């Protein structure tokens, strides 16, 4: 779920599948399908990001790229949502009946805005806005890539090849240890989720090296599909935030799901489905806007059931509806952000084009 790079390959398709699964997982809450998706959908993104990790880049160069591709988009989206806080309050998206924290319950005055500046923009806790609830991923991916790049710089200075492998192997027990004792660091936050992300990130990096030797076929895809469909019968509500005694099982389940997505992506690549490429290349926009888009369906449910507008404050969706509404949530959660991205780019191009024509128009008027 990195910033759009307009690539057409099986990883782009895997990202498309991942972002579709993410939207479905947020829409189909407390369901069997939700449990299947949460086995692997976030690890898939860390895996895909690690797949493209350039171990020849310098740490400074990677830092610049990460700031440009992760922090700056994060900053722009969170700044917009932050400044529009009181608008969302008037729209009942934030209200006292369904808000879970002070942020999502109250109208903000100057002192309230100032109180959250460091938390949201320095500590990158954009998820507190709720509307950008998925932005915890951006923070974790940023630190994951920087920590990996830092260890790679040490590896290059030592002229060794084992430092990243060592980081991979120690990240697994460290993720368990940090979750058990709730270990964190200033700015970075909880270290357990970061070490889990590093594990999947490095597995993606090494997967790319050995992928030419791996065979994707319909039989392996079907086998992994059966596995991920069977696991939720024995394990309810899995996610990257499972208790420490289940983390090992989660690693295994996530890798099965990742292999399934890569297999499907590899098989679909031959059909050159442009929609999947478009979705995969605009995954960041979908991440940012799908919770906003859900409010369209929630508003319709409120209207036909004569509910209070405060129900717009329920995140991510209004539960207890029939499956048709979950499907509707999924569709708008994917396509409204895509429409926004498409028309926004058309608008920007039109503005740039008009600006470029101003000198020409001035010259014509002078004649």
Annotated model-derived regions:
Residues 1-367:
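Alpha-helical transmembrane segments and their immediate juxtamembrane cytosolic regions
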């Amino acid at each position: 779920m990195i910033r759009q790079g307009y690539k057409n390959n099986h990883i782009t398709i895997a990202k498309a599948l991942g972002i579709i699964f993410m939207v479905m997982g947020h829409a189909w809450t407390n369901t069997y399908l939700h449990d299947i998706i949460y086995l692997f959908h976030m690890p898939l993104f860390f895996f895909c990001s690690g797949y493209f990790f350039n171990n020849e880049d310098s740490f400074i160069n990677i830092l610049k790229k990460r700031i440009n591709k992760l922090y700056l988009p994060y900053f722009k989206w969170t700044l917009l949502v932050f400044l529009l806080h009181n608008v969302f309050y008037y729209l009942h998206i934030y209200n006292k009946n369904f808000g879970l924290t002070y942020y999502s319950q109250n109208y903000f005055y100057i002192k309230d805005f100032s109180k959250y500046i460091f938390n949201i923009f320095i500590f990158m806790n954009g998820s507190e806005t709720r509307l950008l609830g998925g932005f915890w991923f951006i923070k974790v991916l940023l630190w994951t890539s920087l920590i990996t790049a830092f260890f790679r710089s040490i590896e290059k200075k030592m002229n060794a090849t084992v430092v990243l492998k060592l980081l991979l192997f120690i990240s697994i027990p460290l993720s368990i240890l940090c979750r058990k004792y709730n270990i964190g660091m200033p700015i970075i936050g909880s270290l357990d989720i970061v070490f889990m992300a590093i594990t999947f990130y490095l597995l993606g990096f090494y997967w790319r090296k050995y992928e030419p030797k791996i065979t994707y076929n319909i039989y392996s895809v079907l086998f992994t599909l059966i596995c991920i469909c069977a696991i939720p019968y024995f394990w309810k509500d899995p996610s990257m935030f499972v208790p420490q005694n289940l983390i090992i099982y989660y690693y295994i389940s996530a890798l099965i799901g990742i292999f399934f997505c890569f297999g499907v992506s590899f098989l679909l690549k031959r059909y050159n489905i442009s929609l999947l490429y478009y979705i995969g290349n605009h995954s960041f926009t979908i991440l940012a806007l799908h919770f906003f888009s859900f409010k369209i369906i929630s508003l319709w449910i409120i209207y036909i059931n004569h509910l209070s507008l405060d129900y717009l404050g329920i995140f991510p969706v209004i539960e207890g509806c029939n499956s048709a509404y979950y499907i509707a949530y999924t569709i708008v959660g994917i396509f409204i952000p895509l429409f926004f991205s498409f028309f926004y780019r058309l608008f920007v191009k039109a503005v740039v084009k008009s600006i470029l024509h101003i000198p020409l128009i001035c010259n014509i008027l002078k004649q």
